[in-house]
């Protein structure tokens, strides 16, 4: 399964406090094809506002996307583990990935696909959050502009900083009547996976959905 960087009624949230690197974890369960939003709490993990999206594409696979907004005053590293469940609660798939150097106020994206689209009824997730020690954020250095079109989105990102930004991505969730119908991930990098200082790069994404879309929500990832 490929994982990059929401689905819905939050049934439970369990907080586990890690040791050593001050990692905190929260977990939850969400149903398919809906959207959910958590509220801020007191720990580092629970100061992350999460939105989950999921949809089936062409009776072929299912997207699962989580947007995480950092409502803390720390730069954080985020790791996500997702388990897909069938209607009886049995596990049918799992995937893990994360994102680095998420600045205060930044919304970052993590996503995956599941081949077991016809078996999935809900998702369990565990979100681990720790203060970033290895990378620096680039969020405040980036200017983002985008327009939706009849078929998708056209976007540009400018690096206003003085050093190169690494692995700059925009995740795009396309919505119709509030439900996810498709997804794009756009990269803003040269051959060295960098967005150089003073450089603007543009990309286009297409929403492949017979129903079309009436809204698009984005998340930005990057580090240095």
Segments predicted by a language model, with ranges:
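Short acidic/proline- and small/hydrophobic-mixed sequence motifs that coincide with surface turns
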Residues: 71-78, 91-92, 120, 163-167, ...
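Terminal connector regions
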Residues: 112-152, 206-224
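Short, solvent-exposed loop/turn segments enriched in Ser/Thr/Gly
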Residues: 58-65, 147-154, 201
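C-terminal motif of bacterial Sec signal peptides marking the signal peptidase cleavage site
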Residues: 15-18
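Intrinsically disordered, low-complexity Pro/Gly/Ser/Thr-rich segments with frequent PxxP/GP/PP motifs
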Residues: 90-118, 183-210
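Short beta-strand and strand-turn-strand segments in soluble, beta-rich domains
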Residues: 48, 77, 87-96, 135-138, ...
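N-terminal, intrinsically disordered, polar/charged segments of Gram-positive cell-envelope systems
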Residues: 21-63
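Asparagine-centered strand-capping/turn motif at beta-strand->loop junctions
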Residues: 68-72, 156-161
């Amino acid at each position: 399964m490929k994982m990059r960087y929401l689905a819905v009624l939050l049934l439970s949230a369990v907080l586990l406090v890690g040791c050593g690197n001050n990692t905190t974890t929260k977990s939850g369960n969400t149903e398919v094809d809906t959207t959910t939003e958590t509220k801020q709490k007191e720990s580092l993990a629970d100061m992350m506002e999460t939105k989950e999206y999921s949809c089936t594409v062409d009776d072929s696979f299912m997207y699962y996307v989580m947007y995480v907004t950092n409502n803390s005053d720390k730069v954080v590293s985020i790791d996500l583990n997702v388990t897909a469940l069938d209607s009886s609660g049995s596990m049918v798939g799992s995937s893990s990935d994360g994102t680095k150097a998420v600045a205060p106020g930044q919304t970052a994206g993590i996503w995956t696909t599941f081949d077991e689209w016809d078996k999935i009824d809900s998702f369990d997730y565990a979100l681990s959050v720790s203060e970033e020690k290895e990378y620096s954020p680039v969020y405040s250095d980036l200017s983002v502009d985008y327009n939706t079109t009849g078929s998708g989105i056209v976007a540009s990102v400018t690096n206003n900083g003085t050093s190169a930004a690494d692995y700059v991505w925009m995740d795009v969730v396309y919505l119709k009547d509030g439900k996810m119908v498709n997804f794009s991930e756009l990269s803003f990098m040269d051959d060295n996976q960098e967005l150089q200082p003073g450089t603007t790069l543009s990309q286009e994404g297409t929403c492949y959905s017979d129903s079309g879309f009436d809204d698009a929500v984005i998340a930005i990832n990057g580090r240095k």
